[in-house]
Amino acid sequence: MDESEFRVKRSSPTSIAHQPLALVNARLIDPAHLRETMGGVLVVDGLIRDFGAAIMPANLPAHARIIDCGGDCVAPGLIDMWAFIGEPGAEHRETIATATLAAAAGGITTIVARPDTNPPVDEAAVVDFLLRRARDTGRVRLLPLAALTAGLDGAEIAEIGLLQLAGAVAFSDGARAIRNARVMRRVLQYARDFDALVIHYAEDRDLAGEGVMNEGEFASRLGLAGIAREAEAIMLDRDIRLVNLTGARYHAALVTTALSLDIIAKAKADGLAVTCATSINHLTLNENDIGDYRTFLKLAPPLRHEDERRALVAALESGLIDAVVSDHNPQDVETKRLPFTEAEDGAIGLETMLSAGLRLVHSGEIPLARLIAAMTIRPAEILDLPQGRLKIGAPGDLIRFDPDEPFVVDPAKLHSRCKNTPFDEARMEGKVKLTMVAGGIVYEAE
């Protein structure tokens, strides 16, 4: 595979250490303060040295590389808290190399990888493998989630302390809910003792049953079994009650219904250490987009009614929803070109998360700074990471993008190994032009 085809560059450690880099004449998005100003950013030795209106060519070191952004937006690199990377065990779907290529092209500088791989990330050796592979083959930062239970079987608690020491950023069983409430209570207690964050996929699988899309009139018209929104809410409500009992830190991986939002709102009002995310798909698409059984829009959780989508957008705008994720889940052609009931769940999203989110900005539903905050500073705060902010001393993970540049999503040009995008041939606005990690350019559009 010819790397030049992807217009992606490996960072040179020498250039990071010795050549300052400045992005000038930019529309700076400061997500911590929900503020936009014109100015620039200076990165030295991989860290933000300064930013603001005073960053202009006349005030920079003589040997600095200067990039004139021509009024484009500059923001912290995006942090995606929920992505499936096939390595190890499903490299035919995605590898760290291909996923981080896609991420760099989409403005994502930190990927948080799900643990439901083969083998699962339930031993320190697997965490170490992922971190080494990311160093050797990755273009952006990759942080592994480790399992809550051994083998992801929902029974025996994993060695959370050892996994944390090995480098796991948080703990989850991936797209599997822990059914047993007693086990979940013990998991939360154990995680609390290590101040570890629990990220849980809330779904009552018994209630969801054989459902393949959102329960309702549209599912009935298509003749497909539905999944009641209560399947999410019941499990989430149980989890929040257990958080209240244990005092653990809890993050709902994906909330997709107004019922769930009510539960989250009450938990936050009660002072519990609870946060939540939703996917860019659930913010920008609804069940009607499935149309004539489009399997690329068969997702888990399923796309919901338009009223639910609007409730999610309102919750994002208010700050009730903390983070927006790609829910990247590559599936190959053989598992998607099947009848809807037989097709696998999931869609790719690393490369389109930002541009899809900008649809909400262009429609007037969300301010740009609020959208960027949900993809940068809030995930960083939840995971206790130094990146995701415009701040002196923060890592020089930055992106430059034109929020108004139009393009059509061409699956053949996407960098992911699989092409199951829900935005196939969709018209978008918002192109990433440059991505930096630790002060080094890892992607630059031609």
Describe the residue ranges of each PLM region.
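Alpha-helix-loop-beta-strand connector modules within alpha/beta enzyme cores
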Residues: 124-141, 189-200, 352
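His/Asp/Glu-enriched, well-ordered alpha-helical/loop segment
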Residues: 221-249, 317-318, 322-323, 329-404
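C-terminal cap of metal-dependent C-N hydrolases
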Residues: 339-342, 395-446
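Histidine/acidic residue-rich metal-binding segments in metalloenzymes
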Residues: 155-324
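Histidine-rich, glycine-flanked metal-binding segment
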Residues: 2-21, 28-77
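Divalent metal-coordination and catalytic microenvironments
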Residues: 26, 41, 46, 71, ...
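Metal-associated gating/positioning segment near the N- to mid-region
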Residues: 70-134
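Active-site mouth loops of central-metabolism enzymes
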Residues: 81-94, 115, 143-156, 225-229
